[in-house]
């Protein structure tokens, strides 16, 4: 496979089948050096399978991909030496101290002694763990384990860093701190590919690949995806049960997508004025007092829901 000279990662028609089931279906994209590139989609969309192929842990059924200039199918060893990888399980040894985990990974990466001191000091400082270097890893809060795992994955200064749903189960404040670290790595030139199902995290990516049922259904900057949203979103608030309001709008022709958004409803309409009248009329007839029904900018969640509907529904699992 000939790689574009400006691409750190490139996939062309990348496909993976398990028997008759197609987990990843002809996915193509290219990622630039220093870019934070996100995979967004529900469980079962193909995000993890794509990352496993790109890290040469799983051979493609067809198609091709290169990472840091190396073919994932024919140069797996070189690919693995060029990357860092962090999964949602973190892969830390809980019975080791923080510094011992870092030194262990430094040994796995075959770093020379002088580099071990330099890079472990960097990881401790970057993760905010200087004062916990002698702490048993298993006693750390989840957010600190997460930052330690990122430090281990980036210890050898890989050209490309793969993060597979790394913030699952972590509170929003810890997630924001984690993304600050990702930004620092990207600013230093590391290419970062990250999968997530958190919409707010997806906003931090430079570009997003939206995946559903193994297919790439959209690829662009988060702002561009929102700006290209088809139609208008109404933010609807009712006095009664929002779930009842969702059910009441199911057969309203003017309301093509209806979903809960906190205590509000987000309703997609093609014509804002006519759509608003149709929504308010139906809710009023159903005895649900309408507090407000106003147009708002589309969120990434709105974009994703609309695209999935066009593709015939979400992946299962």
Where do the language-model regions lie?
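Catalytic Walker B motif of ABC-type/P-loop ATPase nucleotide-binding domains
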Residues: 161-164
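Hydrophobic anchor residue at the start of the ABC signature
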Residues: 150
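Conserved ABC transporter NBD signature motif
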Residues: 63-71, 79
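ABC transporter nucleotide-binding domain
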Residues: 180-194, 199-270, 297
């Amino acid at each position: 496979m000939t790689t574009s000279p400006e691409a750190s990662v490139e996939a062309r028609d990348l496909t993976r089948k398990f028997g008759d089931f197609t987990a990843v279906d002809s996915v193509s994209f290219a990622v630039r050096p220093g870019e934070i590139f996100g995979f967004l989609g529900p469980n079962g969309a193909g995000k993890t399978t794509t990352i496993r192929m790109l890290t040469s842990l799983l051979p493609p059924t067809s198609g091709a991909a290169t990472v840091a200039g190396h073919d994932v199918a024919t140069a797996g060893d070189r690919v693995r030496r060029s990357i860092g990888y962090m999964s949602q399980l973190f892969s830390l040894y809980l019975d080791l101290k923080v510094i011992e985990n870092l030194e262990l990974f430094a040994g796995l990466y075959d770093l020379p002694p002088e580099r071990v001191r330099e890079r472990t000091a960097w990881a401790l400082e970057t993760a905010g763990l200087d004062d916990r270097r002698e702490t048993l890893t298993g006693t750390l809060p989840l957010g600190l384990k997460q930052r330690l795992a990122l430090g281990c994955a980036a210890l050898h200064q890989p050209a490309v860093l793969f993060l597979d749903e790394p913030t699952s189960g972590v509170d929003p404040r810890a997630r924001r701190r984690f993304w600050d670290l990702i930004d620092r790595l990207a600013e230093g030139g590391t290419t970062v590919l990250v999968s997530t199902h958190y919409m707010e995290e997806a906003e931090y990516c430079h570009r997003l690949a939206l995946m559903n049922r193994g297919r790439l259904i959209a690829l662009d900057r988060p702002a561009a995806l929102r700006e290209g949203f088809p139609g208008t979103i109404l933010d609807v608030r009712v006095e009664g049960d929002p779930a009842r309001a969702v059910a009441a709008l199911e057969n309203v022709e003017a309301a093509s997508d209806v979903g809960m958004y906190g205590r509000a409803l987000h309703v997609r309409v093609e014509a804002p004025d006519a759509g608003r009248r149709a929504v308010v009329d139906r809710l009023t007839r159903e005895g649900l007092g309408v507090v407000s029904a106003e147009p708002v900018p589309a969120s990434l969640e709105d974009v994703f829901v609309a695209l999935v509907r066009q593709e015939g529904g979400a992946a299962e699992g």
